[in-house]
């Protein structure tokens, strides 16, 4: 019939989930796959269907009548063998995800996949009539809180960076040239010149004129009270932050434990930061000293929802367990929601909003703060903002959350598309949750 849709993917890496959920009978998994296929047919998709899995996971991921394609399979002989096994002894043969790079997690080094290795593998596919899809042929950015996360037993959670670079950042690189030089040998037309780099602009200066005390601003809102901590989901909040607060009428010193922390917490006693707990480093406990008549505040951040494997169904955020000190459960909590789903407005003259450089700002110490400022542009264009000297937080540009930064790296710059910038005045708000002297 014509049209732009030539194939439709019925499922993606469902075989990984099947392999990890041995508690569910294989036939039940297969019934799910069959229903997905039926729904696509009922919706009018009459083009070939395919599934996509690691080649060793076809038993759980493939479904009759859909072409099984392999992710990351470099062995052509094995690719053809497993596709034949699950597709009636015939191809076509396709690697649906061929990785010139890899996704990146916070506090881990950049993955390194060589240019020459990718070029050689590209030629191997072409020599053996294997179709392939570069994942990614160009990278992107997980704006806002959309980055997601992986799970493994060592890290518990591996939050993805704001960047989804995949070693393909959007302009010509040596790896691009290596791949291009291989592919041009197998086409009959003249390959056009590579596109010119997108021009970038430089932001001349940014003036941060206002500062706000986030803990105080949060407590201006209406709290939700509960004997035990409530999760983000129980608070009807998907992303961002929740401030958990409780008061002590007696001094208490000892070991603070939050085994159900999801995912990152900064701990404050009477507004003074005393430490951090971090699920990605398996840090769920610390020593704490709470004086008489003091307030304990725990600011919890959702670092990204797990989107691969069996843990996708165990993705509750916030504090999902009791909080204990010396083994005794702490009760009587107030929870303040900070979804950060829109750019906060810092209104001069409002309580807890101060002029930058004032004594009140100096007194904030290492509390979490909001900085607001402006910058002016004569022309717009794509650019990057370097946050290497900051701690941890998020940035809004003209109302848009452009993503997270964190000194743990490896990412230190955030991408700002030119279409989100204005000629003339632009507004920036930085939520800095550590507020270190960096």
Describe the residue ranges of each PLM region.
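Carbohydrate-binding surfaces of carbohydrate-active enzymes
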Residues: 1-4, 9, 15-16, 20-23, ...
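Short beta-strands within extracellular/lumenal beta-sheet-rich domains
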Residues: 238-247, 365-378, 412-414
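Aromatic-lined ligand-binding clefts that engage carbohydrates, nucleic acids, or primary amines
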Residues: 254-268, 296, 375-398, 405-406, ...
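Aromatic-rich membrane-interfacial microdomains
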Residues: 273, 277-283, 403-414
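Surface-exposed, short loops/turns at beta-strand junctions within beta-sandwich domains
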Residues: 289-292, 419-423
């Amino acid at each position: 019939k014509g049209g732009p849709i030539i194939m439709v993917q019925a499922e993606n890496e469902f075989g990984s989930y099947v392999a990890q959920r041995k508690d569910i009978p294989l036939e039940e998994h297969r019934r799910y796959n069959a229903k997905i296929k039926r729904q696509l047919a009922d919706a009018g998709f009459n083009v070939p269907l395919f599934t996509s899995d690691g080649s060793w996971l076809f038993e759980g991921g493939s479904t009759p009548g859909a072409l099984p394609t392999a992710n990351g399979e470099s062995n052509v002989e094995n690719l053809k063998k497993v596709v034949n096994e699950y597709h009636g002894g015939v191809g076509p043969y396709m690697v649906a995800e061929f990785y010139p790079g890899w996704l990146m997690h916070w506090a881990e080094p950049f993955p390194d996949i060589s240019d020459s290795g990718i070029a050689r593998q590209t030629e191997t596919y072409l020599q053996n009539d294997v179709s392939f899809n570069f994942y990614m042929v160009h990278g992107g950015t997980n704006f806002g809180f959309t980055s997601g996360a992986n799970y493994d037993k060592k890290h518990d959670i591996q939050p993805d960076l704001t960047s989804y670079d995949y070693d393909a950042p959007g302009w010509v690189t040596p790896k691009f040239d290596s791949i291009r030089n291989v592919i041009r040998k197998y086409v009959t037309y003249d390959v056009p010149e590579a596109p010119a780099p997108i021009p970038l602009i430089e932001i001349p200066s940014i003036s941060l004129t206002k500062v706000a005390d986030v803990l105080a601003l949060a407590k201006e809102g209406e709290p939700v009270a509960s004997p035990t901590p409530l999760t983000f989901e129980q608070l009807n909040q998907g992303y961002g932050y929740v401030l958990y607060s409780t008061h002590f009428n007696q001094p208490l010193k000892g070991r603070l434990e939050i085994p159900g922390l999801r995912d990152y917490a900064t701990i404050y006693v009477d507004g003074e930061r005393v430490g951090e707990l971090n699920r990605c480093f398996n840090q769920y406990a610390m020593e704490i000293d709470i004086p008489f008549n003091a307030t304990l505040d725990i600011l919890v951040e959702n670092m990204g929802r797990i989107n691969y494997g069996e843990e996708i169904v165990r993705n509750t955020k916030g504090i999902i367990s009791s909080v204990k000190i010396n083994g005794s459960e702490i009760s009587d909590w107030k929870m303040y929601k900070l979804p950060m789903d829109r750019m906060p407005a810092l209104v001069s003259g409002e309580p807890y909003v101060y002029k930058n450089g004032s004594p009140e700002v100096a007194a904030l110490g290492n509390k979490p703060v909001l900085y607001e400022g402006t910058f002016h542009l004569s022309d717009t264009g794509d650019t990057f903002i370097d946050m290497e000297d900051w701690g941890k937080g998020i940035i809004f540009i003209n109302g848009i959350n452009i993503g997270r930064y964190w000194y743990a790296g490896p990412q230190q710059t955030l991408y700002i598309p030119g279409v989100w910038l204005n000629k003339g005045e632009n507004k920036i708000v930085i939520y800095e949750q550590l507020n270190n002297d960096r």
